[in-house]
Amino acid sequence: MSTTASQQGLTARAPALASWLDAHAETLDTDATLSGEVVPQLASAGLLRVGVPVELGGTGGTIGDAIDSVADVAAHSFAAAFVLWGQRTFIEYLLQSPNQALRDRLLPALLCGELAGATGLSNAMKYLSAIEPLQIRATDVTTLSSSGVGGGDTSSWRVNGGLPWITNLRKQGFVAAAAVDHEAGGPPSIFAIAHDAPGVHRSDDLDLIGLRGTNTAALQMTDTPLREDDRITDNAPAWLVRVRPAFLGLQCGMSLGLVRRSLDATNEGGPAARSAVADDVAALTDQLASLTTRLKSGVLRGEFVDTPASLFKLRISLAELVHDAATLEVQTGGGRGYLRGLSGVARRQREAAFVPIVTPSLVQLKNQLAAQREQQLKTGTVT
Ligand SMILES: Cc1cc2nc3c(=O)[nH]c(=O)nc-3n(C[C@H](O)[C@H](O)[C@H](O)COP(=O)(O)OP(=O)(O)OC[C@H]3O[C@@H](n4cnc5c(N)ncnc54)[C@H](O)[C@@H]3O)c2cc1C
């Protein structure tokens, strides 16, 4: 299979990873046989260190560069890009955490791909939007543990609850970020929960229609002990507002790569098909360039911390672009796209179907924007 323009970025900077992904993209989507290899492959190509300061073990650069890496991988394999999103987003949580000891403890293993990082914060994002309550509760046991043998003087808790969906729960070892409500009251916290902590149970992989090589499962905690050393933040709502642009920016990277690849694939059709869609492809290509620039500069300049609505609108526009580009690819691919093993058309249709549902989902964002607009109308502050 020849390399398309959208694939040249990764092929140039990480040729071994690019060929591995091209050889296994279908397998990564349809079964779990290679699920343990994805994080080490991404690490060998150096992608986990992109946008991480050199003094912390990274290769420097910006969050914009990390968004580009996710997009580059998505042009080859959306499943691998989703794993990269989970891992790199967890790394970002540590970079933005005030808990330096936690960062020092976990970062080296995450950057070299020995440990997988999973982000279970959909529940927290939905909580922020008043859609659902937090699903994990913490009981403060500080007094109990500090009076027991060997007890320390730092806060400690026991947590109970679960998360129905988390990606990158690599069976060889993971740490998962989860938001936790405190029985004692106060703002919820976000903790890093280790795979081998007592009471942690990872389900079997969920029986997905695609993205099956992503180690996606449910996670249950029963009386799991956690300490201050495990806490990413003690004020989840305030911290999430600051981290959300990077979280969403990296997630949007997956859409950028998918759109690029689908638009490139329209060139693989015959001359008549190409000319029929040429104007549409040109319009979508322009939109892609403009959305890419706005996304990366907005995240880099920190604009979306105070104006999340503009980021939500970008996410919605990108999801619509994914849909339009994937549809054009189907049209130009003809019957070949409907035959197994001849192209990535069917796989990209499944991948595109995931984009609107990943949190924050399109319906969630549309409702939030509508509520905000209603509020502005009431207060006469429509812009
Ligand atoms: C393959 C896969 C991997 C995933 N990986 C992760 C992961 O790594 N980490 C993680 O945290 N999550 C993950 N998720 C969860 C995902 O991000 C979404 O949260 C989940 O798919 C949507 O939740 P639900 O199906 O329970 O939606 P439901 O709660 O059933 O809601 C259906 C839809 O309506 C929206 N909705 C519900 N109530 C409201 C409301 N009041 N106002 C507006 N909109 C509303 C929801 O956002 C959703 O789009 C994954 C999901 C899948 C399919």
What are these regions (language model features)?
Residues 1-60:
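A generic N-terminal leader/anchor concept
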Residues 22-30, 271, 289-323, 327-340:
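C-terminal helix-coil-helix/basic helical segment that borders enzyme active sites and/or dimer interfaces
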Residues 34-44, 48-160:
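Glycine-rich flavin
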Residues 105-108, 125-128, 135-137, 163-167, ...:
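A generic local secondary-structure boundary/capping motif
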Residues 162-200:
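A short core secondary-structure module
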Residues 206-289:
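Glycine-rich beta->alpha junctions and the first turn(s) of the following alpha-helix
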Residues 257, 282-289, 312, 316-323, ...:
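Generic structural signal for well-ordered, non-transmembrane alpha-helical segments
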Residues 336-383:
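Glycine-rich phosphate/cofactor-binding loops in nucleotide/flavin-utilizing enzymes
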